[in-house]
Every structure is written in C-alpha cells, then in structure tokens.
C-alpha cells in the first residue's frame, strides 16, 4: 500500500444513519403536516481535492439508497483539480489522457478525472437506486484547476475571462462581470446538463462561494451572473442550487427566488466567535438563514460546524469520531443553520433538506478501500 492509510466507505454509514435520524426527529419539531414530502437528505462529496473512482462513488449511492428523498452532490471542481472530463477546457479522454489503475489521468496535470461515460454510468446507477445525483461545478471562484487547463489549451479564451494582472484572486477567480466569463461557465454547464438528465429531480449546483476575499454590501454584477446562469439552467429543466455566503442582504430582492440555497455559514468560516475582517463583514452584509427564508428562498441545511467532515487522520481518531457524532445528535437539528450558535430559524417550512459534506482538504495520502 506504499504506507498509505486506508479508510472504508462503509465508515460513513454510521454518520449517515445519525443524520437521517436527526432529520426525521426534526419533522416533529417543525410541526409539518405529515402529508408533506419529507426533507431531502444527502451527501455532498468533494471529488476534486480527494478523487474517488466511480466504483467508490457507487458505494455512497448504495448507502443513500436506504433513505427516501436522498441525493449525492458531486463537487466536481475546485482549485486542486477538475475531476471530470471537460471539452471546454481541453480535458478529454481522446487527448492528453491515459487510462491506468482503473481511472483516467490527465497527462498535462497528472491528475485523475471521471470520463463522461463514467458520469453517465453513475447517473444510471443512482437512478436505479432512487438516489438523485447532483453535479456541482464551482464558479466563479475556486477555479484554479480549470483556469490552469484553459491557459494551456485555449490561452486566448483564458485572457478574455481572467481578472486583470495583479488582482490578488486572479489565480482562482474569473472576471464574472464580463459576458465572456458568463458564457464560458454556461458552456461548462451545458456539457453536463444532458448527462444528468432523466432523473426524478433535476438539480445543478453552481458554487458561488467565497467570491473575492470579503463580503460586500451589494454586488449587482454577481446577481446578474447568478440570475443569468439560473435562467439558462431553467431552460434546460434544472433547478439551480448555490452556496449562501456571498448573497448580500441588500441584494435579496433581485435574486431569482427559484434558486435553492445550500447554507453553510454566514461568516464564511467555522468559528462562531471569530472577529476577523471576513467574519465581521459577513455578519454585516451577508444574509442570514432567517433573512433568506423571509425573502422567499428555499434552503438546505449544510451547517459547517455540525455537518462538515474532513476524512483524514484527525477525523478517524476514535475520540474525534465519537465526539462529532455525539455533538451532532445532541445539539443539531434542521432549524439550526449558524454553526454552533444554537440560533434557530422561526420555521422550517421552506427548509427542504440537509446534507453531510465530505471535504478532501485533510485526506492527504489516505486511500479509499472498496467494500
């Protein structure tokens, strides 16, 4: 194994069971009509920072298939890697790629990716298990891997969408004020809308977290960017999902209300007591869960304190694992969005679900064992 530590996908099953239990308990607390549809329950899986082969992703689907209204959100791109085939940036199986060890490898970047055939097979498999598979393409930030590929394979287009030289976020943020940048992202989405079609529900997550370093009072250019992509996805038969942390209070009235918000943190971090500039700006300018609900949005609870997990040496320590589970069960429910503040929204009527999120920052050289 080359001294790599191994974790099994089945280790997440216990966490999933606890999440589903907590959501079911919240049904009573929320005083919902029993005839209403139960909240969606799912997993968001980061396959960019930590790549998972298709056979492993199927095991997550198997785990989720035990629960009604379940979904698996694939975080397919981030700064570290574009984990799927993408002709728009020149990452394809028929050019600059080799198939080895059961996966495709980009010979330009030396990074693995799922082919479109892999993705279509996963969608078909998820559909057979009554699990909805949701694509997420991170934009307009967290795009370093995509920009690196574009710079190599289409330098003219790279120049058209990048931020001006000297901009601190040029390495991972496109200039979303430009029509060319919006068209570029739309083209990437268009590669995958046909592949994820034909499911019981059609969702597409467009990212939109951590745009620029600090939240701002208002951002009309971001509103235009998001609404344009939402309108495009609607015409393709999809409901748009996006992260919450750059939705400004001042802009609530002008965002399309059919966008569903996956809410992780108002302050853009995990420490509810943080007083740094980003947290302070978030409290001042970013809409809270309650404000989003009051404005007419539907929310999914992705609370970054309780439902975020980072597989790796620290997480799999028995005492850490036990504390995480016990804390989740004792202190979280569907109404609690803002980290471990204990603050609850007044009603969960438009809280349509929740997810555990598995991020790859700490996975390091951990390998994944197939069951």
Please give the residue ranges for each predicted region:
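Catalytic domains of carbohydrate-active enzymes, especially glycoside hydrolases
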Residues: 56-80
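Active-site mouth loops of central-metabolism enzymes
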Residues: 42-56, 170-180, 364-367
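Active-site neighborhood of glycoside hydrolase catalytic domains
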Residues: 172-259, 265-271, 276, 282-289
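Bacterial N-terminal signal peptides that target proteins for export
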Residues: 2-11
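Hydrophobic faces of well-ordered beta-strands that scaffold small-molecule active sites
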Residues: 41-45, 70-74, 133-137, 204-206, ...
């Amino acid at each position: 194994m080359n001294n790599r530590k191994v974790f099994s996908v089945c280790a997440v099953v216990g966490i999933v069971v606890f999440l589903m239990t907590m959501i079911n308990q919240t049904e009573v607390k929320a005083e919902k009509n029993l005839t209403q549809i139960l909240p969606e329950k799912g997993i968001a899986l980061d396959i960019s920072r930590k790549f998972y082969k298709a056979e492993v992703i199927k095991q997550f689907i198997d785990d989720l298939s035990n629960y009604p209204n379940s979904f698996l959100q694939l975080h397919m791109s981030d700064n570290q890697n574009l984990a799927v085939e993408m002709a728009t940036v020149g990452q394809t199986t028929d050019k600059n790629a080799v198939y080895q060890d059961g996966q495709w490898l980009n010979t330009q970047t030396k990074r693995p990716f799922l082919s479109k055939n892999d993705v279509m097979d996963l969608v078909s498999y998820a559909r057979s298990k009554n699990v909805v598979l949701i694509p997420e393409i991170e934009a307009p930030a967290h795009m370093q891997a995509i920009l690196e590929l574009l710079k190599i394979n289409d330098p003219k287009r790279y120049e058209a969408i990048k931020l001006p030289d000297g901009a601190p976020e040029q390495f991972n943020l496109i200039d979303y004020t430009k029509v060319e940048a919006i068209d570029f992202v739309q083209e990437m989405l268009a590669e995958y809308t046909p592949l994820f079609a034909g499911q019981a529900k059609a969702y597409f997550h467009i990212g939109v977290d951590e745009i620029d370093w600090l939240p701002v009072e208002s951002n009309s250019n971001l509103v235009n960017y998001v609404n344009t992509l939402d309108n495009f996805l609607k015409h393709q038969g999809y409901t748009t999902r996006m992260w919450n942390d750059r939705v400004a209070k001042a802009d609530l009235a002008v965002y399309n209300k059919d966008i569903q918000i996956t809410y992780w943190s108002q302050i853009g971090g995990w420490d509810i007591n943080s007083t740094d500039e980003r947290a302070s700006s978030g409290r001042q300018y970013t809409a809270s869960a309650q404000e989003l609900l009051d404005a007419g949005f539907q929310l999914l609870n992705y609370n970054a304190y309780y439902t975020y997990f980072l597989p790796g040496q620290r997480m799999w320590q028995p005492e850490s694992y036990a504390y995480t589970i016990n804390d989740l069960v004792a202190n979280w429910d569907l109404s609690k969005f803002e980290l471990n503040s204990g603050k609850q929204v007044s009603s969960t009527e438009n809280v349509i679900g929740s997810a555990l999120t598995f991020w790859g920052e700490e996975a390091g050289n951990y390998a994944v064992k197939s069951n």
